[in-house]
Amino acid sequence: GLDKNTIVVFTSDHGYHMGEHGHWQKQTLFNNATKVPLIINVPGKDYISKISNSPVELIDIFPTLMDLTNIISPSHVVGESLKPIIENKSSDVRKSALTRWRNGYSIRTERFRLTKWDINGDFQYELYDHKFDEEELNNLALDSSYSLIRDSLIKTINRRIIQADMKPEGIGRQIENVLQM
């Protein structure tokens, strides 16, 4: 039947606040709003205890499906295939996951979250260590004992923002041409 040759993907587009951090709904960059379930079931794979904490992004789903079905992804695809994680849960395909909401960006590694807010050109940061603070209640951005981690993550988030804002070759020009008419 279909269960023998169908890949099933289950996810959600965002988490939801129920009063945490004084917020309701999804409109933040805290873990409550950005961490979503992602379950990929591939026929013939053994999934007992196959839980990975590797950071991934939803843009990784398409290249993963292409890779699992042995189809070459188009060159403009920016996600990463999660096939290495599916085959070995201790694998990583990326070191951080990037999220954007309004005037803020956030990256999540296995241990840390750094959020960068642009307040009229003035950058402000939040840094959380999930080893000691899973609820993201203690902002460590100004804690000198975390300065090396913070500075490293600031470089990473700036690089990831530039990469995320780049348009792939040949994509988007059709829309820009229509808007100029």
Tell me what each language-model feature is.
Residues 25, 45-56, 68-73, 136-146:
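Active-site rim elements
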Residues 2-50, 57:
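Histidine-centered active-site microenvironments of extracellular/periplasmic hydrolases
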Residues 14-20, 59-62, 66-130, 135, ...:
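C-terminal cap/loop subdomain of S1 sulfatases and analogous C-terminal strand-loop tails that border
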Residues 12, 26, 121-124, 142:
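A general marker of short, structured functional hotspots
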Residues 1-2, 90-91, 145:
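Residue-level recognition of short, well-ordered coil/turn positions
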